[in-house]
């Protein structure tokens, strides 16, 4: 079984081919990604119109390249998976219309994938992970703690009530005059900084629910930065280190709460998982690995190239759905907003 995956929900254009090996484990035959960082850097963030135009310009040839690298043809593909949301609606439409056209012309099943679900299922591609597991899904636009019980079966245990983790990193980077995207820049600066110089708050720590709030932390950092202006290079490094340390503490505490809630909705987790672009952050990965070890769980995070948006995760989610007979027709809509997990009942 070979699946073509197409991803255009934000500022990466991606196409990939994924198959099942003889051991029933996922295998990536091709994974092509074109980033738009250069196009958006001057604006300090993603400009939807520019993103959509860039997808149009490169998607067709990227799909062709993925098929070629995989040593296959559209005729040999068993299904066409596409991220149908959530995301920037212009980009989502471009990917979805392309996938619908290919499915119609080649007479292949169309598999409309939730972008967040694809992140959630990536550990099953990379590690063959069994259900159920606790997922921290953290990216520029989303921060959620989710009990992943099965394909299409998710229970949200916590979410952010304001900024997503990746969004907070990006805003801090912009405030400090760092480059775009902000997350890697803040992490790089933090390596040479003192995480104890600034006593920044740890919002929501100790709360019974597993929700996040980072706006107060971001505001506290801004106040410190304004007090120190003009900022020396060491000030910037120390602010980044202090901010990252605060985020790590919040994440670990929120995961601890979610682990307690997990048993009530899904039994015992097989692992603690991190996915999404923020899962590439080394400090967060190390802290989560330590937290998992304390409670006797393994910690799983995708390889760094699969933390950000990519076509392989879309193809894999499509493959998982196709094996269950979950096929979509050509009327499936593009969705700017598309929640993929139910809200857990209040304790």
From Swiss-Prot:
The keyword Acyltransferase applies. It is found in: Cytoplasm. Its cofactor is Fe(2+). Substrate binds at residues 137-141, 170, 183, 281. It is an enzyme of class 2 (transferase). GO terms for cellular component: cytoplasm. Gene3D superfamilies: 3.30.420.40. It catalyses: L-threonylcarbamoyladenylate + adenosine(37) in tRNA = N(6)-L-threonylcarbamoyladenosine(37) in tRNA + AMP + H(+). Required for the formation of a threonylcarbamoyl group on adenosine at position 37 (t(6)A37) in tRNAs that read codons beginning with adenine. Is involved in the transfer of the threonylcarbamoyl moiety of threonylcarbamoyl-AMP (TC-AMP) to the N6 group of A37, together with TsaE and TsaB. TsaD likely plays a direct catalytic role in this reaction. This is tRNA N6-adenosine threonylcarbamoyltransferase. It comes from Methylorubrum extorquens (strain PA1) (Methylobacterium extorquens).
């Amino acid at each position: 079984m070979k699946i073509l995956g197409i991803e255009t929900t934000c500022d990466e254009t991606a196409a990939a081919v994924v198959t099942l090996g003889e051991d029933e484990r996922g295998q990536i035959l091709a994974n092509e990604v074109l980033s738009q960082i250069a196009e958006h850097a001057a604006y300090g963030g993603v400009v939807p119109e520019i993103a959509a135009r860039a997808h149009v310009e490169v998607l067709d040839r990227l799909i062709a390249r993925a098929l070629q690298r995989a040593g296959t043809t559209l005729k040999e593909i068993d299904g066409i998976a596409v991220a149908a949301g959530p995301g920037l609606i212009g980009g989502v439409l471009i990917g979805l219309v392309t996938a619908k056209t290919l499915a119609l012309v080649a007479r292949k099943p169309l598999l409309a994938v939730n972008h967040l679900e694809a992140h959630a299922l990536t550990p099953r591609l990379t590690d063959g992970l069994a259900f159920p597991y606790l997922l921290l899904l953290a990216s520029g636009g989303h921060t959620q703690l989710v009990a992943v019980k099965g394909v299409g079966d998710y229970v949200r245990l916590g979410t952010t009530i304001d900024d997503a983790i990746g969004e907070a990193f990006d805003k801090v980077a912009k405030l400090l005059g760092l480059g775009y995207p902000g997350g890697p820049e803040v992490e790089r600066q933090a390596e040479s900084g003192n995480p104890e110089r600034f006593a920044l708050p740890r919002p929501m720590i100790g709360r019974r629910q597993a929700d996040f709030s980072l706006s107060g932390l971001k505001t506290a950092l801004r106040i410190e930065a304004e007090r120190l202006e003009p900022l020396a290079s060491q000030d910037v490094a120390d602010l980044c280190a202090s901010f990252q340390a605060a985020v790590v503490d919040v994440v670990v505490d929120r995961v601890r709460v979610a682990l307690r809630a997990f048993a009530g909705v899904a039994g015992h987790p097989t692992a603690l998982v991190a996915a999404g672009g923020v899962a590439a952050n080394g400090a967060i990965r190390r802290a989560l690995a330590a937290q998992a070890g304390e409670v006797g769980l393994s910690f799983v995070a995708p390889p760094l190239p699969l933390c950000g948006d990519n076509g392989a995760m879309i193809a894999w989610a499509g493959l998982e759905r196709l094996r269950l007979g979950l096929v979509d027709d050509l009327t499936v809509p593009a969705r700017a907003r598309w929640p993929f997990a139910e809200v857990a009942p209040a304790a």
